[in-house]
Amino acid sequence: MTESASCHGGGVCGGLAQEEGQRQVFCGLTSIVWLHRKMRDAFFLVVGSRTCAHLLQSAAGVMIFAEPRFATAVLGERDLAGMADCNEELDRVVHELLARRPEIRTLFLVGSCPSEVIKLDLGKAAERLTAAHEGRVRVLPYSGSGLETTFTQGEDQFLTTLAHELPASPEGAPSLIVLGTLADVVEDQFRRLFDQLGIGPVHFLPPRTGADLPPVGPGTRVLQAQPFTGEATRALIRRGAERLDAPYPLGVEGTRSWLQAATRSFGVPDEQLEAVIEAPIARAQAALERQRGVLSGKRITFLPDSQLELPLARFLSEECGMQPVEVATPYFDREFHGRERDALGEEVRLVEGQDVDAQLDRLRADRPDLTVCGLGLANPLEAEGLRTKWSIELVFSPIQGFEQAGDLAELFARPLVRHETLKV
């Protein structure tokens, strides 16, 4: 994050309090769990420790009926002590992997805390391996290290690497890139809406296969679908693209404004947009109405975890009648998150960063009806009588767009309904 994008140090900056201290977050390797499902001809090889391997195996434990598209090249004690040639062993592992999995077209070498501590140059390794397998596979490096990051930034690093690999578009050729991983069903819904609006060509990054990397250039518009794509967006801007300023497509109003940013950029009249989205909005409003009775008036606190906190709080406040007490986010980027912050108003306590002990003290004093937090904090808070929602579930679930608005609201209603059902 650049200095202009965020204030640094403790205190309050532009109405946003900042905290530094002990944190409770997953590292960027966790993003592989959803990225490997998206790019179907890619493979993610983590160069890390046994701890890295255990994290991925635990996070992706549901993948028991299919061979996953990720693995860990484990650095042993001799590697970490500098007593072995890591590059030679890495080459051997990659050669065996490609011989066993001939369908791989793009291989990502994913850096970890251990590989970065011993300064293993995965960039040079990727160049060497690409040359060794020329015409067979493209090898690309990126960092999934947990040093000073949160888990969704793993996707940002991944997308930034892809941004550098995109082909150049013809000078001035108009196109739209939707940036950030979306569930296939959501992607298909958005594509149909863009087709009905006459906007195109539309590309989604990341694509479903490495062969579908979109071109980028001066005529390209970028529409962020996820709030944790800041560095990738800047990389596309450096390639000549233009970012469209919009809220994130959560809920009816977020999705409408998100689509409107695209239609106005492409010269589509507002009347045409409203005609196209009238039916989806009606379905979304009906689905939301079923959840408002549970959510309206309830108080909610977000602990920092995924960077989805601000747009989720905006959706729950505007469309479900919830009252955000404190909304904390791991990183705040004024350029990309400012609209979402402004929508929450002055009465909501906003925090960037984490001092987990201080935040837990405030949480116990506030006693909100629902707390959105990481897995490691959920059970202890439940034991204290606080109802919780796992933040990582909101990253894995299809929540964007009109058709998912009711499902998104239901994700927050479930723990409240469960609590009332189990109350003695």
UniProtKB/Swiss-Prot annotation:
EC number from the UniProt entry: 1.3.7.7
Function: Component of the dark-operative protochlorophyllide reductase (DPOR) that uses Mg-ATP and reduced ferredoxin to reduce ring D of protochlorophyllide (Pchlide) to form chlorophyllide a (Chlide). This reaction is light-independent. The NB-protein (BchN-BchB) is the catalytic component of the complex.
HAMAP family found in the cross-reference section: ChlN_BchN
Gene name as annotated: bchN
Residues making up the signal peptide according to the UniProt record: none
PANTHER family, A to Z: LIGHT-INDEPENDENT PROTOCHLOROPHYLLIDE REDUCTASE SUBUNIT N
Similarity-based family: Belongs to the BchN/ChlN family.
Oligomer and partners: Protochlorophyllide reductase is composed of three subunits; BchL, BchN and BchB. Forms a heterotetramer of two BchB and two BchN subunits.
A Pfam family that the UniProt record links to this protein: Oxidored_nitro
Domain of life: Bacteria
Molecular functions per Gene Ontology: 4 iron, 4 sulfur cluster binding; ATP binding; metal ion binding; oxidoreductase activity, acting on iron-sulfur proteins as donors; oxidoreductase activity, acting on the CH-CH group of donors, iron-sulfur protein as acceptor
Catalytic reaction annotation: chlorophyllide a + oxidized 2[4Fe-4S]-[ferredoxin] + 2 ADP + 2 phosphate = protochlorophyllide a + reduced 2[4Fe-4S]-[ferredoxin] + 2 ATP + 2 H2O
Top-rank EC class of the record's enzyme: oxidoreductase
Alphabetical UniProt keywords: 4Fe-4S, ATP-binding, Bacteriochlorophyll biosynthesis, Chlorophyll biosynthesis, Iron, Iron-sulfur, Metal-binding, Nucleotide-binding, Oxidoreductase, Photosynthesis
Free-text remark on how the cofactor is bound: Binds 1 [4Fe-4S] cluster per heterodimer. The cluster is bound at the heterodimer interface by residues from both subunits.
GO terms, biological process: light-independent bacteriochlorophyll biosynthetic process; photosynthesis, dark reaction
Native source species: Halorhodospira halophila (strain DSM 244 / SL1) (Ectothiorhodospira halophila (strain DSM 244 / SL1))
Cofactor(s) required for function per UniProt: [4Fe-4S] cluster
Name of this protein: Light-independent protochlorophyllide reductase subunit N
Pathway: Porphyrin-containing compound metabolism; bacteriochlorophyll biosynthesis (light-independent)
Residues bound to [4Fe-4S] cluster: C27, C52, C113
